[in-house]
């Protein structure tokens, strides 16, 4: 569905997601969830592991990072995460891909400047 919607988009379409995340949504990239990559804070505290799963809150960022079993979350690691493609876990993975290597950055530049060139 995303591939059909986003595959031949007009130049004027503005999205607030990274180009590699949009490619992930279109099925052109594979990523693992990075559940700690987009932490949520609200009046109840720091929500773990992400705002989609209701697994409680902690009062400090340190508690969130050190006391959450991050390896227990993500597609294939937790049944609640099955079929998830939401930005709160996968956008961080796409950003890591972008800035983790020169080739990732080059892919992002190409997609940004030439979105319909494949």
Model-found features: residue ranges?
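Accessory C-terminal segments flanking Radical SAM cores
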Residues: 2-109
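Long, charge-rich boundary regions
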Residues: 114-118
